[in-house]
Amino acid sequence: MSDSVELFTDGACKGNPGPGGWGALLVFKGVEKELWGGEANTTNNRMELTGAIRGLEELKRPCEVTLVTDSQYVMKGITEWMVNWKKRGWKTAAKEPVKNADLWQLLDEQVSRHNVKWQWVRGHIGHPGNERADQLANRGVDEVRGIKS
């Protein structure tokens, strides 16, 4: 794994649940690729996860990835909680089914292809990559709602 990629991801939702969007900004050797999409009835957490999944899916070969997210849910889920969810058969400590297990499993599959370094940043404080991912996620929401950007 020699290729080094930065991946900035975000999710947005107008209502929770409600129309939502995800965004991902890939940066490789100074070249940027923007990805976004949305769903008519979803949650902010599902969109945060989808942004990370779609960004990693876009990589055609194993890479060194620095994935930057403003989602504590994604960050803690992948770095702290998932190991125990998997041991318990995708159940929480309270023996409840893990919410969004379908997406967590897809994310786990994508992460296993790469060497991912997870980085959390506070949202909406002007971090350039995070702000771009936020704009892309909101573009996804707007497209689902039929608003042209």
UniProtKB/Swiss-Prot annotation:
Residues 1-142 form the RNase H type-1 domain. Disulfide bonds: none annotated. Coiled coil: none annotated. It comes from the Bacteria. Keywords: Cytoplasm, Endonuclease, Hydrolase, Magnesium, Metal-binding, Nuclease. Its main location: cytoplasm. InterPro entries: RNase_H, RNaseH-like_sf, RNaseH_domain, RNaseH_sf, RNaseHI. One of its GO terms (biological process) is DNA replication, removal of RNA primer. It is an enzyme of class 3 (hydrolase). It catalyses: Endonucleolytic cleavage to 5'-phosphomonoester. Pfam families: RNase_H. Its EC number is 3.1.26.4. One of its GO terms (molecular function) is nucleic acid binding. Binds 1 Mg(2+) ion per subunit. May bind a second metal ion at a regulatory site, or after substrate binding. Mg(2+) 2 binds at D10, D134. Mg(2+) 1 binds at D10, E48, D70. It is found in: Cytoplasm. One of its GO terms (cellular component) is cytoplasm. Its cofactor is Mg(2+). Monomer. Endonuclease that specifically degrades the RNA of RNA-DNA hybrids. Belongs to the RNase H family. This is Ribonuclease H. It comes from Pseudomonas savastanoi pv. phaseolicola (strain 1448A / Race 6). The lineage of its organism: Bacteria, Pseudomonadati, Pseudomonadota, Gammaproteobacteria, Pseudomonadales. The gene is rnhA.
